[in-house]
Amino acid sequence: MATGALLPCSRPCPMSRLDFLKASHFSLGPDLRLHEGTMRTTSHRDFAYPAATREPPSLQPPPALLFPMDPRWDREERVSEAHRAFPPPSTPPWELLQAQARERTLAMQAGNLHLHEDAHAGIGLSNAHAAYGWPELPARTRERIRGARLIFDRDSLPPGDRDKLRIPPTTHQALFPPHDARPQPRAPSCHLGGPNTLKWDYTRQDGTSYQRQFQALPGPPALRCKRASSGVELGDCKISYGSTCSEQKQAYRPQDLPEDRYDKAQATAHIHCVNIRPGDGLFRDRTTKAEHFYAREPEPFVLHHDQTPESHILKGNWCPGPGSLDTFMQYFYGQPPPPTQPPSRHVPHEKLQSHVTLGEPKLLKRFFKTTMGSDYCPSEWRQVQKAPNLHLQQSYLPRGTGEFDFLTMNQKMLKPHRTPPAPVTEEMLQRCKYSHMEPPLGGLRFFSTQYKDEFPFKYQGPAALRLKNPQEGFVPLGTPHQRGCREKIDPLVPQPPMYLCPSQQ
């Protein structure tokens, strides 16, 4: 600045110092200087904002066109069909807009927001605000807003009692007051059935069945830790948790309205749809149909011609008690001696059965047993009652007899130390020899071998070894003797052999 003061000014400054400072700052609102010499769109030309000046139409002669034009078209204003059909709304006079802008500027200056004035018109107004203004606020609302802004400018918190002094209402709360808090109930229309004919024995019950059955024990409330306590108290703990609300909801609540605007008793009297609460209401779920047409218990179904047994599947323990789960080894070797009787070295023959005779009829029903045979047993057969023994161990795995007839050479040589079995008598050997099963054909042996001839089914004398060719066989050639159709043959009677053995010849 000092250098500029010493040097001679080549040209005078067009603006003073204050104007220069104003021009160096930004200004709000449209700047008309920006639109000078710029191309405008069709919408800006047809729908210009109020501050803009419409350019006069050029009077230059139009260039020669292919089709001749009517000279009356140039004199008429060129507008679009939509603009001609729907003209824009009438704008307020320019003086009214300037007065509104001046009031708004004074209100903004009162809030410590100082803006430099601009020489251009329409400062602080947008195009939409200038074209489409909203309705003005009442004078009382303006004073409240202006006073609230002044208080807010001085201090963020208004002076006075903070519990009684609330935040001033907003523009929406001032312009749109709430409706009537207690509207008058309307009479029910006739086409909806008229007044409610159902009379319910409804009484208000705030507590539930769970609260009635499981009541809390009386006692002081639990003490809270100081570190866990909060400075924000959401309601009074002595009253209940019903008045719990946040600070924003408490500040921006409807003015001069009761706390409980919903009358439950009044709503219950005029309601048609009854909500049944499970377990709390007095409605016992009784209907006319349930009272008069009650469900009767059905009679038991009995089938008189049913001869089917209970089940064809054998149960696991049909005859419970000791001795019902015996194994084959325990059955043949008898029960172990009681602890009072000392064990003897030789087991008597009455308690020992070392061989299974396949042809003995007494053991037929014990070992060859089916499901049907056990379910449909004959009347003369009775189950053997076994002596109770407390030292009998339950086992489902048959272990076999373990005698020398079913042992290998290794098992015969390496025997564990146990009670030796009784010696085999001659009577037992003879009974074992003569108790084999006889085939139904008797002595007719169609496919005989050397082994079968030397060791036949029935005992035919002492066994004698013969030195013969083992490849030689005795297969009958031809067909056997054909008997008549009416001839009866007893299969149990031994038949004469077709080819006699060499010893019998």
Swiss-Prot record:
InterPro entries per record: SAXO5
Record organism: Homo sapiens (Human)
Protein name per its UniProtKB record: Stabilizer of axonemal microtubules 5
Tissue: Highly expressed in testis.
Pfam families associated with the record: SAXO5-like
Ranges for region Mn 4: 448-462
Record region (Mn 3): 407-419
Location of the region described as Mn 2 in the Swiss-Prot/TrEMBL record: 169-183
Residue stretches in coiled coil: none
